[in-house]
Amino acid sequence: QNICVSGDLVEADAACYTGDAYLADWPATLDALTAMNFDKLVPGRGAALLTPDAVKKGLAYTRDFVSTLYTSAQEAVAQGMDLNATMKHTRKAMDPKFAQVFIYEHCLPFDVTRAHDEASGVRDPRIWTAERDQEMWHELQK
């Protein structure tokens, strides 16, 4: 039936959770999925994508979300911004496109934290602990 169950690799009108992602690698993975030409796709969040055109749109949406996030973090890190400033910088690019989507406000702090880490050279995601969670919120609320 040519159906892909992508899990959180692809979202449909929902924020991507990237707190433990490899952001630089994600677009290549989306390229591989695109090349498979699925007729239907079940995303991690959002409605099932029931036509090839809807699948293409879901893949493009996810690529845009992840690329906008990571590019913004790379720009911020290149300018020496801390996590709080990176969040503000990233919101300028992300909010106009994604602020209205499901779980955006919930995911964004974790997404920006991971993007800032990866853009700073932290290749492998750090484990989320209660302490790390508190540190993140403290940094973001400065």
Residue ranges of predicted features:
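Catalytic core of the metallo-beta-lactamase
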Residues: 1-28, 32
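Short, well-ordered beta-strand elements within core beta-sheets of diverse protein domains
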Residues: 14-18, 75, 116
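C-terminal regulatory/interaction regions
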Residues: 79-142
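Divalent-metal (often Zn2+) His-rich catalytic cores of metallo-beta-lactamase-fold enzymes
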Residues: 27-85, 89
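Alpha-helix C-capping/helix-to-loop hinge sites
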Residues: 13, 72-76, 93, 97
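Alpha-helix capping and helix-loop boundary segments enriched in small/acidic/polar residues
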Residues: 17, 57-61, 103
